[in-house]
C-alpha cells in the first residue's frame, strides 16, 4: 500500500482529481463536458486492459529473471511491446478528444495529460516532507 491507502482507493481519488482538474482547466460547456467524459470513459477500459497486460509482462519478467538469456530477452521484449501498446491507447484517447474541444482547449488537454502524472508525483513528494 502506498502512503497508507489501498491502490484501488488511490486510483479512484486520482480519477476524481483528474476529472475536476479537467473541468476547471478546460472550461467546457455542458455539451462538451458530456461528450468529453463519455469518450474518456470509453477509452479508459482500453487503457485499463493495456495496463493490466503491461503489469503481467513485468511480473513475468520479474519472476523469470534467472532464466536463460533467450527467455529473458523474450520477456524483456514483451514488456517493451506492452509498454508501447499502453502508450498507443493513451494517445488514441487524447486524439479522440480533438473534435470535442476547441483548438485552445485541446492544446491544454494534451498538456494536462502529459504533465498530470508528474504533478501528482510532486504533490505526493511534497506531502511527505
Q: Which residue ranges define each predicted feature?
A:
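Soluble, non-transmembrane alpha-helical interaction regions
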Residues: 9, 25, 30, 107-109
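Basic helix-turn-helix/winged-helix DNA-binding cores
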Residues: 9, 13-16, 23
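Amphipathic, charged alpha-helical segments and their helix-to-coil junctions
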Residues: 13, 34, 42, 87-129
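Amphipathic alpha-helical segments
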Residues: 18-100
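Bacterial Sec-dependent N-terminal signal peptides
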Residues: 1-10
Amino acid at each position: 500500500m502506498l502512503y497508507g491507502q489501498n491502490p484501488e482507493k488511490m486510483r479512484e481519488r486520482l480519477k476524481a482529481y483528474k476529472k475536476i482538474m479537467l473541468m476547471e482547466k478546460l472550461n467546457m460547456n455542458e455539451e462538451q463536458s458530456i461528450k468529453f467524459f463519455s469518450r474518456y470513459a470509453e477509452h479508459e477500459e482500453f487503457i485499463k486492459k493495456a495496463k493490466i497486460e503491461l503489469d503481467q509482462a513485468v511480473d513475468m519478467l520479474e519472476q523469470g529473471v534467472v532464466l536463460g538469456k533467450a527467455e529473458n530477452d523474450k520477456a524483456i521484449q514483451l514488456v517493451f511491446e506492452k509498454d508501447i501498446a499502453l502508450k498507443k491507447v493513451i494517445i488514441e484517447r487524447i486524439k479522440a478528444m480533438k473534435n470535442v474541444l476547441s483548438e485552445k482547449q485541446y492544446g491544454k488537454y494534451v498538456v494536462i495529460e502529459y504533465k498530470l502524472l508528474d504533478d501528482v508525483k510532486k504533490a505526493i513528494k511534497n506531502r511527505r516532507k
